[in-house]
Amino acid sequence: MNFSDIYHSDEEYFRKLKDLKAVHEETMSKLEKMYQDKLNIKDIQAGFIRDGISDSSSSSASEKSCSHPALSVTSLSEPDLDGSSSLSTTTDEGLPDLEEKTPGESSAMVHAQELINNMWNDFSVEDYIQYDSDSRTAKKKRKKAKSLTPKITVPVPFEMTVREQNRREKALSARSDLETKLLKRDEDDAECKKKFRANPVPSCVLLPLYEDLVKQSEERRKKARERNRAALLASLKPFKFIAREEQKQAVREKKLRDLFRAKRKTNQFKAKPVPRFIYRPAASDKPKEEELYGDSRMLPKVRDLLQNSPWPSRSACRRFRDPRSPAKPRGKHRRRCLRRDGDLEKWKEPFSEYSFLKCPMLCEECCLHESPCDSDKRQKLLADIRADEEILRETRRPGRSPRRKSPGRSSNPKPRPHECSPPMPTASSRGREQAIRRSEKARMREYWQELEEQEEKLQKRPMLFERVTQVVFIG
């Protein structure tokens, strides 16, 4: 936005405002003149009527009555005619117009003019004291008393002119304020449009001078040390036994590798199968098993024998009957079978001499008829064996030596006779075996740790020429 355009537009606005003000003042003056003429005509007509009615009144009273409205006319016209022409001039200017307007009433107008001209003759303020109580109170209310000047008037500016002057001053001040506000707003807009982007703080500011010097000196020292080391290495002659030391190191490493491979191959643990005697029943179960086994072998033979044997005589039947038992009624059809208890007891004894060794399959079949307490013990034993195998499988590492055989268990158990049962593992034997296993694991762990430490020492040990160079650098 250009300020010159604003300035020209403001000038044009004020110029038009002044033109309008001049036109307004002209119209207001015309209106004021017309208003005064109207007021004068009304006052003159009222005085003429009063003079016609009072025929026998005295001349002094008529003069006072006529002068009183004239004064009222002046009093009415004074507040509106501040700064204008005097009352006499206005009346002189207005009378010719009245004569033109009312030619039939020329005598009345002449009489009124004479009254106006002789109005100030024998004038005294005391004559109006008794009549003008209201005007006196109104004068007291005024801020400043006005002196009675019949012919000379003090020019006082109109309120409208004062108001216009104040408006002009306010407009000028408002214009200056508007210009300053516009300038300030433009400056603020220009400042707001600017984008401040601060540059990062340079790194040299954060580092003090002393640290820079120390860093530079350290770099120079390192460069000098590297230069001296390169010169010494260039001037160093290799010894004759360097190749021999390298060969020894290669042979040593090869031996270690072969040793580790052999240990990995030989030390792999392989669990042996559980011996069959563990699954055999206990010694307390053997009589029961033998009895069941004998019954199972004898029953078919007894049945075959009973079926093929002839029927016994009546005397034999009477022998087996209990005399104390009540007599049973004889029916048409009799049972032709023997009592089970007596027959079995009778025929069981001759076949007891058939005793022979039991095969493993029959032994396993008889194990199905064992007592629940023995089966629980056997299940616990098998669970312990499986747990030991799982622990060994978890803790086993390639290259370890096999676990030492426990005294309680042997890989090749001696054949025991059929009559004796294997010893059952107790809590103390289990604790002993666990302690042995723990000690073996600890010893193997220590052994492998020692081997690793030796390897680290061998790898970290410098060669002879390296030690010589270190001695040279230190010297």
Curated annotation (Swiss-Prot):
There is a cross-link at K377 (Glycyl lysine isopeptide (Lys-Gly) (interchain with G-Cter in SUMO2)). Residues 255-434 are annotated as: Required for interaction with CFAP418. Residues 327-337, 398-407 have a biased composition (Basic residues). InterPro entries: FAM161, FAM161A/B. Residues 53-107, 314-337, 389-441 are annotated as: Disordered. Residues 162-234 form a coiled coil. One of its GO terms (biological process) is cilium assembly. One of its GO terms (cellular component) is photoreceptor cell cilium. Residues 430-441 have a biased composition (Basic and acidic residues). It is found in: Cytoplasm, Cytoskeleton, Cilium basal body; Cell projection, Cilium; Cytoplasm, Cytoskeleton, Microtubule organizing center, Centrosome, Centriole. Expressed in the retina. Belongs to the FAM161 family. Interacts (via central region) with CFAP418 (via N-terminus); the interaction is direct. Interacts (via C-terminus) with microtubules. Interacts with LCA5. Interacts with CEP290. Interacts with SDCCAG8. Interacts with FAM161B. Interacts with POC1B. Interacts with CEP78. Forms a microtubule-associated complex with POC5, CETN2 and POC1B. Interacts with CCDC15. Involved in ciliogenesis. This is Protein FAM161A. It comes from Mus musculus (Mouse). The gene is Fam161a.
